[in-house]
Amino acid sequence: MQWDLFCRVVDNHGDLGVCWRLAADLGSRGETVRLWVDDASALAWMAPQGATGVELRAWPEAEDEPEPGDVVIEAFGCDPPAPFVARMATRARAPVWINLEYLSAEPYVARSHGLPSPQRNGLVKWFFYPGFDAHSGGLLRERDLLAQREAFDAQAWLASLGLARRAGERVVSLFCYDNPAVPALLGQLAAQPTLLLATPGHAARQVRAALGDTLARGELRAIELAHLTQVNFDRLLWACDLNLDRKSVV
């Protein structure tokens, strides 16, 4: 089938990361995907190798863009362009239109997943909520991901980045927005041997502001990571004892 996946980049790479992962996974299963993005610049480091079956397209502006595919996904309520939606309504067989929502464990997911939203042009938009139980849309996961994780060698992967865990040291990653609690967090981490891996952008900037150029305090030492590909970001999570990810601990 032909899929059209629409993504507007807001901040901190999460929206584009989810959409790329979905597009690449669909492509690996033999599907054909057009990924429409208003700012795809982060893919230069996130997925420099591209993906089989995935065509990256700039956000459509012209009236003469390709005919909509069999499935149209708008990520996080980004609203496909009106001319594209109008062409969706003229297809002999209307495409399946999915609004991909944010991952959540809240109770509303069970109530909202799979609900239809009839549109004035006769199309129906369906709400898709990822989640953690059978009442949700589940989780996006590549078919061989668990096998890769089982075979993963954390020490070897850290060494490939020029890093090494010292004896008795825990490894912690930090990926976050600007947060006034970061200095207090670093103070707590400094109480026992900790290697903190700070991702580029918000996290690294706040860590440097709190620790200074030494990037160290007490038992804590911090490293500012370079941008990682999506594949290597998975491995970062696997290599750590604790992952502090935006607003949640994973």
Where is each model-derived feature located?
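Active-site and donor-binding regions of nucleotide-sugar-utilizing enzymes
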Residues: 6-122
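Donor-nucleotide binding loops and adjacent catalytic segments primarily
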Residues: 156-158, 164-235
